[in-house]
Design a protein with these regions (language model features):
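Accessory alpha-helical/coil subdomains and C-terminal extensions
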Residues: 99, 110-112, 120-122, 129, ...
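Short, ordered loop/turn segments at secondary-structure junctions
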Residues: 10-13, 41-46, 76-77, 113-116, ...
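Glycine/threonine-rich beta-strand-loop-alpha-helix active-site module
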Residues: 25-58, 126-164
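A cross-family phosphate/adenosyl-ligand binding-site feature
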Residues: 1-9, 20-104, 115, 237-242, ...
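A C-terminal functional module that forms or caps the active site or interfaces directly
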Residues: 265, 269, 290, 295-302
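Short glycine/serine/threonine-rich phosphate/pyrophosphate-binding segments
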Residues: 14-24, 48-49, 93-94, 105-121, ...
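Flexible loop/turn connectors
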Residues: 302-311
């Protein structure tokens, strides 16, 4: 009897999605041959809700190892809206279960980040056979040491910091580089250290703008005519640490700085230190393009292991890497949790030893 396996990619795109899809497909075809059929759900959970899917062939998975983005398309379908019936009167959970049944799926593989995993867990609790795969450049999925896409994003952010050094030095400027990472600062911490940033500001460690300015002035007194500040997009200051997210976001918008902290930090540094300060936001560049060699290997490991889980009929789990071993975690154990940079993180100690200010 043929096994029918569905695959979807949900949430923001990142390097390594296609490499993971390929890893799953090649391993399934190698194990089952003609006794497996792969169904691509288009545009994430949105396609699962609307019944938008297609039958895939082996040809669909050729030449995609190095391809950025996702051949299946993706959309953000927030978990908090999954049980909300909107103006279209669609019961999203019931619709997803219907598509699963109509497509005659034996199981569904969900590639995505924290929100994707929460919905995957919901579907597993609803009785569907679900396997998750951890995708995010933020590296913040609980229960895994690394997610595919993270290392490529760090490489890109590091190159940005590298290039900013020369222009900062030439113009005697302070440069604030905004790195993706809303709730967790892993990309900023890694790229900040790799790129030689002088100040690194993370969501987990509320910064004091006076300490930031003091670090800039201290470098100037020692003869450095520029400073590099790596800022996570989710960084908050000590005042905001006592507020709800909606409250401090509203205050930022009202002040004309936008939702992230970077522009406000730059304005304060220039005002307090007198040094010309500029902002650089690489933005979606960090999510685009071909995955690094590391992420291609990791994606292939994860994809092939997911195929093994399909063979074992082990569902309600997500793939993870722990201590250099690929394992499976139960979805119910990791869904809704965030892997933040802990205070005892070795890289924070390294940064402090190097004289890097953490705000």
């Amino acid at each position: 009897m043929k096994k029918r396996v569905g695959i979807l990619t949900s949430g923001g795109d990142c390097p390594g999605l296609n490499a993971t899809i390929r890893g799953v497909a090649k391993a399934l075809y190698a194990r089952f041959g003609e006794n497996v059929e792969i169904v691509g759900i288009l545009n994430g959970y949105h396609g699962l809700i609307t019944g938008d899917y297609k039958e895939m062939t082996e040809d669909d998975f050729r030449g995609i190892l190095t391809l950025g983005g996702t051949i299946l398309g993706t959309k953000r379908t927030p978990f908090k809206m999954m049980r909300v019936v909107e103006d279209d009167n669609i019961d999203k959970v019931a619709a997803m279960k219907k598509t699963y049944k109509d497509a005659k799926l034996d199981c569904l593989l969900c590639l995505g980040g924290n929100g994707t995993h929460k919905t995957a867990n919901l579907l597993a609790q609803e009785g569907l056979n679900i396997i998750g795969l951890p995708k995010t450049i933020d590296n913040d999925i609980y229960g895994t040491d690394v997610t595919f896409g993270f290392h490529t994003a760090v490489d890109i952010a590091t190159e940005v910091i590298d290039r900013i050094h020369t222009t900062a030095g030439s113009h005697s400027r302070v440069m604030c580089i905004e790195i993706m990472g809303n709730k967790a600062g892993w990309p900023t911490l890694y790229s900040g250290i790799a790129g030689g940033a002088d100040i690194i500001l993370l969501p987990e460690m509320p910064y004091d703008i006076d300490r930031v300015c003091s670090a800039v002035e201290r470098r100037a007194r020692k003869g450095s005519n520029f400073s590099i500040i790596a800022v996570a997009e989710g960084a908050i200051n000590t005042e905001e640490a006592g507020m709800k997210r909606k409250e401090w976001m509203a205050k930022r918008t009202e002040a004309g700085y936008g939702a992230t902290a970077t522009n406000r930090i730059a304005a304060a540094v220039q005002k307090k230190t007198g040094m010309e300060t500029r902002v650089c936001i690489p933005g979606h560049m960090q999510r685009g393009g071909s995955p690094s060699a590391y992420d291609r290997v990791l994606a292939t490991q994860f994809g092939s292991y997911a195929a093994k889980l399909v063979e074992m009929e082990r569902y309600g789990v997500t793939v993870a890497m722990v201590n250099n071993r690929v394992i499976a975690n139960r979805l119910e154990d990791i869904a809704g949790k965030t892997r933040n940079v802990p205070e005892g993180c070795e890289l924070l100690t390294v940064a402090r030893r190097m004289g890097v200010s953490l705000g």
